[in-house]
């Protein structure tokens, strides 16, 4: 059928398929019965079409690092199944997920969106996720292909990575997704790879992806991430996104007629687009692109379970789990206590059905006999709190506000990211909008107004210009680097007074690749200052135990910018120190998208890492704190003692954050625990580490044989729960090559198994390895090579908690195709 359709197409029609129709849909060809399909952002939900802000509500799942922390592919596959259903509820046939870039520096703004520092764990998570999504008739899109481990100058930076490092660290998750999960789409990354944009890199998109791995699906660009006509399609990029076309269309037709692109190349890409439509069932039944909210009880329960399964208990001085009857006065303190920090920022952001804050979850778990106290202590937000409350938005044709508004609407939040406009009479390239709201302060004193805008804007309070985002506007880091840095100004306001807040916005005159990025965010907050910490200390003093909720939020952990350091932002470290000096019973609950330094670690009794676990945050946290379930997570990323213990953080800026348009992956294969192991650097908490509420004993590992053949072998380990509670343990299998001919890490994760055991129960971890698991990439031969000889199989509970090792022998060299 597909070839019949192609035979009837003109060149222009084939070319039309190779660019999006708009931001979220492909092109339809009605005369041939070719429907359009919709794609939607993930990975922790399905946002649907329209803006990155707002939209139809969706189930908000834990972010990828939280899924990686479960070490449970079966559970992740269940999440994928649910997310496939969420995508369909938004009329989408393609989910733009999962993200499988590697945790390299600890500072990547999208660290939260990726599973792990280890390629084997990342690959296992990705395969499970993809299998789940695609079981629902929705195509998964693995991204970002490849070496997109930083947000700094991401659209122009060249990631300079040697081939061995690519083959052993950064490519394996993509390879496994193709070979084991049959992923239907791949998204190229923004960056260059060794000087060539990934979207026009024939070695990457054709030689490796298609010829070596056998991928037959669609390769699409990241949004605005293609930069040429002939180069991209000749390299193997099928779909330019978003639409309408910028470098395809008439330009590609001309390139074919001028002999720069073969007609067969266009047909091959068009065929892959049609094949994608066939695979998602679009020819059988044209997709209904309508969007609706799908809020299922089973999704709620799964998200709650995932939150606990990914929670990592880093320290426990006998205080957890909390007995509800043991404490009369419980303090819940911190900037993340009453705020539900459920996800990261950027394109992964969705409108959740609902959110449960830690304070709400803890309060719901406690009986009325408990006295719960709350204090914020300090702020941790990167931007001023977004304006919340009813406001009128008037839209005008052109720049300026002298004509009558074309459209008027009411919204509840001072944040806008316009991909389209509410009236067909408006043009993104030439419109303006006026927002009018009333602000009533609760307290008298200094308030800070803040605003950031892609375009030009001014904020007035009672007619006075307070924030000027117009005169002197310069590009900064917000809204993916298209807006200015947040402009702030302090104003003294009186309690209970009504202030008229007006923001006037004009679309930018410049554009990005022919598309105007129009965005605005404004807010107001009263700074807490010393009084906030003093209130927290007094609250702690009056309480038996303190639950201290600290970390970051989705304006720190976000697409578009990297973190400045690995410390808790704002005055949170000061808050922890002050509270811990007042009350000896402090449990710190962390919410971050990656590792942080903990100079206060010795002063608190427990530390629980919750990540960003989705809409059920507060309930999942309460389940863990009060022992209804155990924290079952293990770290998917090493937590170093200091930022400089990361292999990518050196005195050489060319290694990170990059210099002169290049970032050198000079650490090579020594990423994460591979670096800590080999360089003998003690971590704060090792890869694979996590405490629980019960105890286990492990039996000696058993081998199916001592000689490795082509079919591999199996290691089994019996694990017994000797405690009085149900719990989980993760058996990790690492390979050590004592007689390696080339430099190799001390050990590398090759298999793992998570066992969930009742008290007194015994389970068996079954760990399978193959010759490829013993191999390194031989650059000269262009093959993976496992040299004959002795290998050690290390059975461990973390990268440093080694329980046993056994020796195997590889009788002959194994040379394997990549």
Swiss-Prot record:
<feature type="domain" description="PA14">
    <location>
        <begin position="386"/>
        <end position="538"/>
    </location>
</feature>
<dbReference type="InterPro" id="IPR037524">
    <property type="entry name" value="PA14/GLEYA"/>
</dbReference>
<keyword id="KW-0326">Glycosidase</keyword>
<dbReference type="InterPro" id="IPR050288">
    <property type="entry name" value="Cellulose_deg_GH3"/>
</dbReference>
<keyword id="KW-0378">Hydrolase</keyword>
<comment type="function">
    <text>Involved in modifying a vir-inducing plant signal molecule. Hydrolyzes coniferin but not cellobiose.</text>
</comment>
<dbReference type="InterPro" id="IPR036881">
    <property type="entry name" value="Glyco_hydro_3_C_sf"/>
</dbReference>
<dbReference type="InterPro" id="IPR017853">
    <property type="entry name" value="Glycoside_hydrolase_SF"/>
</dbReference>
<dbReference type="InterPro" id="IPR026891">
    <property type="entry name" value="Fn3-like"/>
</dbReference>
<keyword id="KW-0963">Cytoplasm</keyword>
<dbReference type="InterPro" id="IPR036962">
    <property type="entry name" value="Glyco_hydro_3_N_sf"/>
</dbReference>
<dbReference type="InterPro" id="IPR002772">
    <property type="entry name" value="Glyco_hydro_3_C"/>
</dbReference>
<comment type="similarity">
    <text>Belongs to the glycosyl hydrolase 3 family.</text>
</comment>
<dbReference type="InterPro" id="IPR019800">
    <property type="entry name" value="Glyco_hydro_3_AS"/>
</dbReference>
<dbReference type="Pfam" id="PF00933">
    <property type="entry name" value="Glyco_hydro_3"/>
</dbReference>
<dbReference type="GO" id="GO:0009251">
    <property type="term" value="P:glucan catabolic process"/>
</dbReference>
<dbReference type="InterPro" id="IPR001764">
    <property type="entry name" value="Glyco_hydro_3_N"/>
</dbReference>
<protein>
    <recommendedName>
        <fullName>Beta-glucosidase</fullName>
        <ecNumber>3.2.1.21</ecNumber>
    </recommendedName>
</protein>
<dbReference type="Pfam" id="PF14310">
    <property type="entry name" value="Fn3-like"/>
</dbReference>
<feature type="active site">
    <location>
        <position position="222"/>
    </location>
</feature>
<dbReference type="InterPro" id="IPR013783">
    <property type="entry name" value="Ig-like_fold"/>
</dbReference>
<dbReference type="Pfam" id="PF01915">
    <property type="entry name" value="Glyco_hydro_3_C"/>
</dbReference>
<dbReference type="GO" id="GO:0008422">
    <property type="term" value="F:beta-glucosidase activity"/>
</dbReference>
<dbReference type="Pfam" id="PF07691">
    <property type="entry name" value="PA14"/>
</dbReference>
<dbReference type="GO" id="GO:0005737">
    <property type="term" value="C:cytoplasm"/>
</dbReference>
<dbReference type="InterPro" id="IPR011658">
    <property type="entry name" value="PA14_dom"/>
</dbReference>
